[in-house]
Structures are given as structure tokens and as C-alpha cells.
Amino acid sequence: MRILVLSDSHGCVDPMQQCVELVQPQAILHLGDCARDADRLGRLYPRIPLLGVPGNCDYGSADQPERLTELGGVRILMMHGHTRHVKSGPMAAMYAARECGADILLFGHTHQPLVDRSGDFWVMNPGCI
């Protein structure tokens, strides 16, 4: 399954569209900042399932800051990361992911890309967009 993971778009929808056109994903995950960008992307590509979580700039969102989902038989914990203080390091977020049985932790907020693996557990941050 091809999944496009985006985060911290901050109003820049055009680069997200370019990513969708390039990757041709079967699902899109948006990790917050800004949820309205994800909504716009969902309207542009209504046939592609889109899941998201709010970030620290998504004021007034009623959505939960963390979302556990399963795609292609893989359990993924999605979060923006600000509530787990990921700018100080991903350890608290990693602990939360392991506690809920996730295979992959996806987070944003830091604007720094990260791909790390510990055994069969993956930690990933797409950076910005």
C-alpha cells in the first residue's frame, strides 16, 4: 500500500498537490498544522482516503491529538507531537506508540525529517510537507 505522509503544511497546498500527483498514493495521512490544508486536499482528491490529526496551530479543532489507525495490516499511531513534547525528543511519543501496540509512529511539529527503526518498530517524521 502506498501511503503519503504530510505534516506542517502551514497553508502551502500546492506542494502537497505536487506530492499527491508524484506519489499517486492509496491513502494520505496529514499530521497537523494546518488541518484546513488537509481538508482542501481532501476536496481536491475525494477518492483518496485522507486521515489527519490536529497540530498546535489548528485552534479549535475537536479532533483528538492522537489517532491509532491500521492500514495494510500495519498499526500506525499518528500525532502532531506537540502534546508529547517531541521537540525535546521523541521518547514520550515512542512510549505512547509502543503502549498502544503501534508498528509505526508518525509525528510532525519539529519540521525536521526523521526515519528511525528499532527492530520492527519504525519512527518517522516527514519534516515540513
Regions found by a protein language model. Give the residues of each.
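Active-site environment of divalent metal-dependent phosphoester hydrolases
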Residues: H10-D14, A35-D39, C57-A62, R84-G89, ...
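A generic structural signal for ordered alpha-helices
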Residues: L6, M16-C19, L71, R75, ...
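N-terminal active-site segment of His-dependent metallophosphoesterases
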Residues: M1-I48, D58-P65
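Helix-adjacent hinge/juxtasegments
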Residues: P49-C100
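Conserved beta-sheet core of the metallophosphoesterase superfamily
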Residues: I48-L51, H85-I129
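Short secondary-structure boundary/capping segments
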Residues: V20, G42, E66-E70, A96-A97, ...
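Active-site neighborhood of phospho(di)ester-bond hydrolases with catalytic His/Asp-centered motifs
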Residues: V5-S7, A27-D33, L51-N56, L77-H80, ...
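Beta-strand-turn-beta hairpins that frame and shape the catalytic cleft
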Residues: M1-I3, L68-L77, R117-V123
